[in-house]
Design a protein with these regions (language model features):
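N-terminal ligand-binding/catalytic initiation module
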Residues: 1-202, 432-440
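Generic secondary-structure signature for well-ordered alpha-helical cores
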Residues: 12-16, 30-38, 108-112, 133, ...
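Rossmann-like adenosine-cofactor binding region
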Residues: 263-361, 366
C-alpha cells in the first residue's frame, strides 16, 4: 500500500462520521500519488498527516433571543485549517446543514483554492446551523452579535479573516463587524464582504461569478472553443449564479436556466437578468415569480436535473448537486465543458464520468477562486487604507483567474495528466503549501 493510500485509510477511520470531509480528502489525495512518487521529501516530513489535520477547531454555542422572547441556541464553528502561506481565510456559512464535517470539508478545499490564487492567504472556514431565512432583521442581528462575541476571540486581520458564504451576506457581515469593533475597540479589515462605505471592495459581489467565467473562457480558448455563442446552463440563483450569468451574457453566451431550492426555470430566449435581480436581490422571492416577467419561460418544481441541452454547464448552487445521472444527461446532450461555481457541486462519480467522456472539467477550487481572491484584494486595500476602482479590481481578478488556469494546466502536464484540471488544481495548490510547511519546520 502506498503512503497516500495508507494515509487515506487512516483519515477515513479517524473521520468516519464526516462524509463530506472524506469525499474532499479522497479527491485531493488520490490525485497526489505522482507527486509523492517523485518527491519523497513530502512523505519524510509527514505532510499528509499534517495537512489533513486542522491546526485548530473551534466549536461553541450561540445563544440568542427571538422576537417572542424565547432563548434559542445554535452551534458555531471555525476550523482554522492551515496557515503556512498566510492568515486563515474562508467564509462563514449559515445554513441548517452545517456541521463539523461540512466545515472541515470546506476548510480543507479552501487551503488549495487559496494557494492557487497566488496570494498570501491560508485556509479556514466557519459557520453555524442557524438559518437566516424566515428570521426578522432583529433576530438575525441578535444571532450575529452572539456569534461574533465568541468568534472575535479567535480572529483578526493578521490571524484569521472570515468572509461571507451561503446565508452570510452584506447584512450579516455588517452585524458581525459592528460587534467585533465594539468588543475589540479596533477598526481593522477583519471581515471581507464589507459595505463599500466602511472598507468593502468594489467587484467583491460579482467576483466569484465573474471569475468563474474568466477561467472558463481561458479553458475553452486553450482547447479550441469559445464561450461566445455557447448555450449555458446555470444552477443556483444566488450571487455566484447571478453574476456568472451576467458575465456569460456579456461574453456572448446565452444562459437558459437558473435554479433555487424549490425549483428551476428554463428560458429558451436567454435569462432576463434584470428580472432575476429584482426577484432575488430586491424582493427576495422564489423563481416561481420569473414567469410573471417572462410568460414564455418554463418553471419546474424540484431539483434541477441538468436535462436541458447545453454546451457549457455551470453548477453554482451547493455541494453534490450534480450526480452521476445528471452527468449522463449532460453527456447525452452534447455538453463539452463543466466548470464548478459552487464548492464541490459535482459528486466524485459524476466527475469521473464527465472526464472519461472527454468533457472539459474545471474543479471548484480553481474555477470559483475569484471570490476569495477578491476578498484578499479587499484585505490589501484595507491594509493600505485605499479603495480601488471597479475596473482595477476586475482587471486584477481576471489576471488571477487566467493565471490559475495556466498553473493548473501546467501542473497536470508536468505530472503526465495533461487536460486533467482536477489533478492539476490539486497538485498546483498542494505543492506551494507543502513546500512552505517544510521550510517552516514541524509546526
Amino acid at each position: 500500500m502506498s503512503y497516500v493510500s495508507e494515509q487515506l485509510e487512516k483519515l477515513k477511520a479517524k473521520n468516519a462520521n464526516e462524509p463530506e470531509f472524506i469525499q474532499a480528502a479522497t479527491e485531493v489525495l488520490t490525485s497526489l500519488e505522482p507527486v509523492f512518487e517523485q518527491n519523497p521529501k513530502y512523505e519524510e516530513n509527514g505532510i499528509l498527516e499534517r495537512i489533513t489535520e486542522p491546526e485548530r477547531v473551534i466549536m461553541f454555542r450561540v445563544p440568542w433571543v427571538d422576537d417572542n422572547g424565547k432563548v434559542q441556541v445554535n452551534r458555531g464553528f471555525r476550523v482554522q485549517f492551515n496557515s503556512a502561506i498566510g492568515p486563515y481565510k474562508g467564509g462563514l456559512r449559515l445554513h441548517p446543514s452545517v456541521n463539523l464535517g461540512v466545515i472541515k470539508f470546506l476548510g480543507f478545499e479552501q487551503i488549495f483554492k487559496n494557494s492557487l490564487t497566488g496570494l498570501p492567504i491560508g485556509g479556514g472556514k466557519g459557520g453555524s446551523d442557524f438559518d437566516p431565512k424566515g428570521k426578522s432583521d432583529r433576530e438575525v442581528m441578535a444571532f450575529c452579535q452572539s456569534f461574533m462575541t465568541e468568534l472575535c476571540k479567535h480572529i483578526g486581520a493578521d490571524t484569521d479573516d472570515p468572509a461571507g458564504d451561503i446565508g452570510t451576506g452584506a447584512r450579516e457581515i455588517g452585524y458581525m463587524f459592528g460587534q467585533y469593533k465594539r468588543i475589540r475597540n479596533v477598526y481593522e479589515g477583519v471581515l471581507t464582504g464589507k459595505g463599500l462605505n466602511w472598507g468593502g471592495s468594489l467587484a467583491r459581489t460579482e467576483a466569484t461569478g465573474y471569475g468563474l467565467l474568466y477561467l472558463t473562457e481561458a479553458m475553452l480558448k486553450d482547447n479550441g472553443k469559445d464561450i461566445k455563442g455557447a448555450t449555458v446552463c446555470v444552477s443556483g440563483a444566488g450571487n455566484v449564479a447571478i453574476y456568472a450569468t451576467e458575465k456569460a451574457t456579456e461574453l456572448g453566451a446565452k444562459v437558459v436556466t437558473m435554479a433555487d431550492s424549490t425549483g428551476w426555470i428554463y428560458d429558451a430566449e436567454g435569462i432576463d437578468l434584470d428580472a432575476i435581480k429584482e426577484i432575488k436581490e430586491v424582493k427576495r422571492q422564489r423563481l416561481t415569480e420569473y414567469k410573471n416577467y417572462r410568460p414564455n419561460s418554463e418553471y419546474h418544481e424540484g431539483k434541477f436535473d441538468w436535462s436541458v441541452k447545453c454546451d457549457v454547464a455551470l453548477p453554482c448552487a451547493t455541494q453534490n448537486e450534480l450526480n452521476e445521472e445528471d452527468a449522463k444527461r449532460l453527456i447525452a446532450n452534447g455538453c463539452y465543458a463543466v466548470a464548478e461555481g459552487a464548492n464541490m457541486p459535482t459528486t466524485l462519480e459524476a466527475t469521473k464520468l464527465l472526464q472519461k467522456s472527454g468533457i472539459l472539467f474545471a474543479p471548484g477550487k480553481a474555477a470559483n477562486a475569484g471570490g476569495v481572491a477578491t476578498s484578499a484584494l479587499e484585505m490589501s486595500q484595507n491594509s493600505q487604507r485605499l479603495s480601488w476602482t471597479f475596473e482595477e479590481v476586475d482587471a486584477k481578478l481576471k489576471n488571477i483567474m487566467v493565471n490559475i488556469y495556466k498553473n493548473i494546466s501546467a501542473a497536470a502536464k508536468k505530472y503526465g495528466h495533461e487536460g486533467d484540471y482536477v489533478v492539476g488544481a490539486n497538485i498546483a495548490g498542494f505543492e506551494k503549501v507543502a513546500d512552505s510547511m517544510i521550510q517552516q519546520g514541524v509546526c
